Amino acid sequence: MAPGMKEKKIDSLKLPEDLRSLSLQELEHVAEELRNELIDTVSESGGHFASSLGATEITVALHHAFDTPHDRILWDVGHQAYIHKMVTGRRHQMGSIRTNKGLSGFLKRSESPFDAFGAGHAGTSISAAVGMRHALDKLSPERYVVAVIGDGSLTSGMAFEALN
């Protein structure tokens, strides 16, 4: 490290399990570092970062609280999940997002075991979580399934049907 440069807390984090031993203050610091790095990276590479910036704290909190990938977090749209990609071992690949042979701009199950659902069309995460939860009730009832959905997606008919 160059003299005068402060080591980032996120440099010591490789996977979500590394978040689980951190204090609330450390988690807040990690969220700030992730947000700043996402802005820098996406400003150069392109992409949609507003939804991920808005979901930074919840992403860090969910990966801190739940045993991912054993527990499943389902993101409604890929734009919410850039920070998720960063904390699940893909941080140093973020410059390749949405490029040929780079990271997908969406959630992609073949890209990571932490991508439990291949989100594409908005409004599907709650329905997918309900279905996944019913399947897990038979196989592994001690697992949790969490759906993350934004305000725009929450207005879709499929989301309302799942809530019903």
Task: Mark where each language-model region is.
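Cofactor-binding active-site loop characterized by glycine-rich and histidine/acidic residues
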Residues: H48-N164
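N-terminal amphipathic, basic-rich helices that act as targeting or association modules
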Residues: A2-T88
